[in-house]
Regions:
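Non-transmembrane, interaction-prone segments in cytosolic or luminal domains
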Residues: 13-22, 56-59, 77, 135, ...
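Active-site HxH/HxHxD metal-binding segment of metal-dependent hydrolases
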Residues: 14-15, 29, 36-112, 129
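Conserved beta-strand hairpin/beta-sheet module of binuclear metal-dependent hydrolase folds
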Residues: 1-49, 123-134, 140
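Metallo-beta-lactamase
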Residues: 118-159
Length: 159
């Protein structure tokens, strides 16, 4: 396997995680929901990685807070939910349900999962047996329903 998935445990009041996928041969990386840029920058510098993509699951500040600084430091493409473009001005690659895109030779599938927010998306990578689901699903349950309905969240969790 040419990839390594890293979990950055962010020590803030919301106890966020930042996921980073490293492509070992190229030393390129993608970061998912970078709440704080400094954690990402420090990790990339310590491991000689170049950040090339940012993937966002939804518009909440604890998932997009580090994007402006990372955009200043790296030449990155920013992927995120088309339905939340008005709330996430950084997105230059808007995504919608059942769309796919690439990171190196990985195929990333996008699923819309409204409930936590109306435009929430998740990233499914079959080759890594991984689902990056933002605030849709937690180890002890699902995320809070802020914008959507409980029916939408139920449908999203069943996808």
């Amino acid at each position: 396997m040419d990839y390594k998935v890293h979990l950055l445990d962010i020590h803030n009041p919301l106890q966020n995680y930042i996921w980073l996928i490293e492509h070992l041969p190229s030393q390129q990386a993608v970061v998912i929901d970078p709440t704080e840029a400094q954690y990402v920058t420090d990790f990339c510098q310590a491991h000689n990685l170049t950040l090339t993509q940012i993937w966002l699951t939804h518009w909440h500040k604890d998932h997009i807070g580090g994007v402006p600084q990372l955009m200043q430091q790296y030449q990155v493409k920013v992927y995120g939910p088309r339905k939340e473009l008005s709330k996430i001005p950084y997105i230059d690659h808007p995504l919608q349900d059942e769309q796919s895109f690439q990171f190196q030779d990985l195929n990333i599938e996008v699923l819309e999962v409204p409930g936590h927010t109306l435009g929430h998306i998740v990233y499914l990578i079959q080759d890594l047996h991984s689902l990056f689901c933002g605030d849709t699903l937690f180890a002890m349950g699902c995320g809070r329903v802020f914008e959507g309905t409980f029916e939408q969240m139920y449908h999203s969790l069943n996808r």
